Amino acid sequence: MRKISKNSPPALLTTYKKQIGASYDDIDKNVYDATLLALLNEQGWVCGYCQQNISKPQNATIEHYCEKSICNGTGGTLDLRLDYKNMMAVCPGKATNDTHCDEKKSKFNPSSGLPIDISPWNTAHIKAIRYTNSGTIKSSIVRHDLEIDKILNLNVSYLKKNRKAKFVSLLKAAGEISSKKGKDKLKRILNDELVIGNNRYPSSFPGMCEYMLKYTK
């Protein structure tokens, strides 16, 4: 995960919310598409949870951080179903038989851990995240570590494998990082990974790349 800085909602969504009887379930396609595009642009076209690259809008969906079934204005809850600040773009959540991100999260309910507490919009939450050279993502906050592992399933085998491959390849490309020359080279490589061109990161896992900058100090 990486810190997401929220922008203003797209004008189409703002206008739609003002309509009498506006609801997310009946949202117009053009409003949905504009909202998804805005979310992808502010996230650099990577999934808000696992940070995999998203190549096109058809490979993404809008995720409600606090579920529509929970934050729906009933039982004393806020109605966040059309709140842009409660939305993010996510990947399909599956490439194997096992699911992750919002696909895995949808299997849970208020009695089994929802809504989650770890937030990609909270700087302190993101700073508590660390990555290992095995591709594992962890948090020093116990509850968040459980959410990462169980509810979001971000350590599913293929994600770990892909993170490990990138982690190792970046270090290998830098050479000997115990030297200043190696550290400087790694820093340049990582900074290139964090450059957003045309609203897009060049590849997956920018959050891990940002974390790896610690090896350059």
What are these regions (language model features)?
Residues 46-49, 61, 89-90, 128-131, ...:
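A structural signal for short, well-ordered beta-strand segments and their strand-loop junctions
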Residues 43-46, 87, 97, 205:
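Secretory pathway export signals and precursors
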Residues 2-49, 71-82:
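Short, charged surface segments at domain edges that flank catalytic/cofactor-binding sites
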